[in-house]
């Protein structure tokens, strides 16, 4: 659903990706930007945590991108000036026929936003709720993250990692970070014996 909505920019005004901290929301937003670029569209993915110290003016001009991804948007809930700035950005994005994708820890109506017009706008498009990933989803995410890092991760090694790694996606991706660092340092490919030795499995 997310992929098809992203490929029809201008049809859905906003996509809200909602879920807990370890459900891979940031990874999904990065994938949305990557998909847009593959489709010859301009895209930007920004973290509200990084923008917050810069003030609401840092949002100006973002509507010029075809796809605008705002990660951790719930960080500005209750901040009146930020909420208004996001509301106006949404309207500008909509006027351009572009797409806004936001990630939130909960559904928009469940968060302490003061500006109800913003809540209604964020609820107006496609809402995707993320929960526990199935194993095949986790495998796909693991393989995609490895590819982004330039790591060669074979199917059998990926399945081996999945069988022994914690269920949380954040823990799984942290394991990949460790393997990446160690394989670079040792100049070794990711094999099952190497993974065992690094992780003590």
Task: Label every PLM stretch briefly.
Residues 125, 139-152:
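Conserved AAA+ ATPase "sensor/coupling" helix adjacent to the nucleotide-binding pocket
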Residues 1-8:
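Pre-Walker A adenine-sensing motif
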Residues 61-85, 89, 96-104:
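Conserved P-loop NTPase "ATPase switch" module shared by AAA+ and STAND
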Residues 108-123:
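Short regulatory helix/loop adjacent to the ATP-binding pocket of P-loop NTPases
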Residues 159-163, 170-184:
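C-terminal helical "lid" of AAA+/P-loop NTPase domains
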């Amino acid at each position: 659903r997310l992929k098809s909505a992203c490929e029809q920019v201008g049809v859905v005004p906003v996509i809200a990706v909602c879920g807990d901290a370890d459900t891979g929301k940031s990874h999904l937003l990065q994938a949305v930007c990557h998909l847009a670029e593959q489709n010859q569209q301009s895209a930007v993915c920004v973290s509200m945590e990084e923008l917050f110290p810069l003030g609401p003016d840092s949002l100006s001009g973002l509507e010029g991108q075809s796809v605008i991804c705002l990660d951790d948007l719930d960080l500005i809930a209750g901040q009146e000036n930020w909420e208004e700035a996001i509301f106006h950005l949404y309207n500008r994005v909509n006027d351009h026929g572009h797409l806004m994708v936001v990630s939130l820890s909960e559904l928009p109506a469940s968060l302490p936003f003061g500006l109800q017009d913003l809540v209604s706008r964020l609820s107006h498009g496609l809402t995707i709720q993320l929960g526990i990933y199935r194993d095949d989803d986790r495998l796909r995410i693991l393989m995609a993250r490895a590819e982004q890092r330039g790591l060669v991760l074979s199917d059998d090694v990926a399945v081996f990692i999945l069988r022994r790694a914690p269920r949380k996606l954040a823990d799984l991706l942290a394991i990949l970070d460790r393997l990446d660092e160690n394989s670079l340092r040792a100049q070794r490919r990711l094999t099952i014996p190497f993974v065992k030795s690094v992780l003590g499995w």
